[in-house]
């Protein structure tokens, strides 16, 4: 299931009774701040999980069109690690 920030804001608005515009601003601010923190360091949200940026080193590869060797450049990847509690909630129905 894909959910947009606008949908989250609408759900928040109906749950809390705030205006949709205010809720959109809150959601955008929260996501912006999470991304800003996660860019610099590991970010842990208690009972949800952790976001961390991992640097991938350059590595050899092959150009599939020409079959010639290439170097795949280094890059940063954002990684999410779910908390133990979140994993337990997800797998709760299997018991």
From Swiss-Prot:
Which Gene Ontology molecular-function terms are recorded?
DNA binding; structural constituent of chromatin
* InterPro entries linked: Hist_DNA-bd, IHF-like_DNA-bd_dom_sf
Question: What GO cellular component entries does it have?
Answer: cytosol
The record's section on Pfam families has: Bac_DNA_binding
Q: Which UniProt keywords apply?
A: DNA-binding
Q: Which residues cross the membrane?
A: none
Which family is annotated? Belongs to the bacterial histone-like protein family.
Q: This protein is called what?
A: Histone-like DNA-binding protein
To which species is this protein native? Answer: Rickettsia felis (strain ATCC VR-1525 / URRWXCal2) (Rickettsia azadi)
């Amino acid at each position: 299931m894909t959910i947009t920030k606008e949908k989250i804001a609408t759900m928040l608005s109906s749950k809390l009774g705030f205006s949709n515009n205010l809720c959109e601003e809150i959601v955008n601010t929260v996501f912006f701040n999470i991304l800003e923190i996660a860019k610099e360091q590991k970010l842990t949200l208690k009972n949800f999980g952790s976001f961390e940026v991992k640097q991938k080193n350059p590595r050899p590869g092959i150009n599939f069109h020409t079959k010639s060797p290439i170097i795949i450049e280094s890059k940063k990847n954002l990684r999410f690690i779910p908390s133990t509690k979140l994993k337990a909630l997800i797998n709760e129905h299997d018991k």
